Amino acid sequence: MDLWQQSARAWIEMYKDAAVYSQKIHNSWSDAFLHAFGTKQNKSTENATLQSYTQNDVHMNKKKIRALILQGGGALGAFQAGAFKALSEKLTREDKQSGNGERPLFDIVAGTSIGAINAAVLVSHVVENKTWTGSAEKLVEFWEYLSCPTPDITKMSAAWRKEHEKNNHGAASEEAARRYYSVKEFLKSGTDKVYSPILPPKDDEKFFDLQNKRALYDKQPLKKSIEKFAKFPIATSYEKGQPRLLVVSTDVAEGKSVAFDSYEKGKDLNEKEIRKTVYDGFNQEPTVIEYNDGISIQHILASASLPEFYEYEEIAGRKFWDGGILSNTPIRELIQAHKEFWEYKIGSTELENSIVDVASLTVPDLEIYLVNLWHSDDNSVPSDPDGMTERHMDIKSHDQYYVNESILITHYVHLIEKLLRLGNNKNYELKKEINEILKDHTTSRSTTEKSNKYLDIIKTQFEITKLEIIERRDDIHTTSSKIGDFTSETIKKLIKEGYESTWKKYPQLVIQRQQ
């Protein structure tokens, strides 16, 4: 076995080991390997499935799927309404200038928690009106509807006001105090459109600790607000040119991130569309949740059921919590769902000796736009209780880890393409040996993961050709209770900030594949 044969096998083994680091990304990394050894039919050598092609042969001709990812973050979601409005204007203009004026604004919208709610409002509008036109205005209207006046905080803030009037430099600003005490008042009395307290608080029936009561809130105000702006169930179709809705939640018993999908996963014997989510359950038995009619309001509430606020949301006998617990930035769920859908669409036809046009058989590449509500870099170490709590939330909710994974996938694709070009002048025997490697099967690591030939996985190769991040930044008046501040002053400010920051400061360009 020469160096190139050893290298090929080594790459496969590396991808198997990489699954320990990130099982969800394993298949995409394997795809990256196979992207380097893409296939074309060669009329003079019919038995060869591996042929040389340049770096851009496939990606120059592949369709691009444009995806929007919306983080969770409670009231901070108003920022996404402004950012989306600016994005819709920016992308519409760019598409017209490039001669793609008929291109859909987004093909996929994925969200967690409040991001899932925003996503549902947007996709529902497109399904109902058969156009993206007006969707940005609809989302802004939704947030204006959710907002409420600043409550009377005079009594609650008396101690702060006394120190503030003494010019105590440690005292919060007047705006920070308004936000902080408004949320404290909301926690006592609720807000009309989002949550209301369930009284009395739940007693501790385990330790019987009188100080350990659990305050819970009713979801009905939020449910009614969502249903006023989105129609359920939401079932969409690629063939109809409708956007795909991905909603992420957390299975409490299994401790797993779960994605609900508006696109079909197959058809039954009567040709009726099947929509379902399958994931490993107890003792590795697969858990199957079917929702053939589409994503319901329960799926949205499951994505937004904060343990600190709401009871579990039950779906098909399973109990769910907020998706942000495990995946506040659902990039990995987007990548996996994109791959699985196109595996289904392309089918399971054997590839050997049959590929004529690689571009027509492979998964469309992804262009991702991510609207972050949290930032991990602050360059400060707070010492006050509220500041420390806020900093903890920022770091925990940012999810930079998953952004790095998506970047890593593309880096591996590019690296292996370069290795391929180095090997393009090797002899036919070497290529034949590599073909044998590609006939090997992947290792199935769970009951829900299929074992495929590496050759078959060629059909699902794709890249993240663009990743743009729009990130909200805190101002000097920020507080740890920012996710609960639904006052009209704050909501209007967040919408404006989202719009202006998207236009004035061009989104951070993380990945841009030059064709």
Give the ranges of each region predicted by the language model:
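Amphipathic, low-complexity, repeat-rich surface-exposed segments
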Residues: 1-57
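C-terminal helical/tail subdomains of lipid-metabolizing enzymes
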Residues: 59, 210, 327, 373-375, ...
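Patatin-like phospholipase
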Residues: 61-67, 75-212, 226, 261-283, ...
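Short polar catalytic/cofactor-binding loops
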Residues: 72-75, 253
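Active-site gating loop/helix substructures
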Residues: 202-228, 235-343, 483
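A short alpha/beta connector and helix-capping loop motif
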Residues: 330-375
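Eukaryote-biased recognition of electropositive, low-complexity segments
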Residues: 337, 382-383
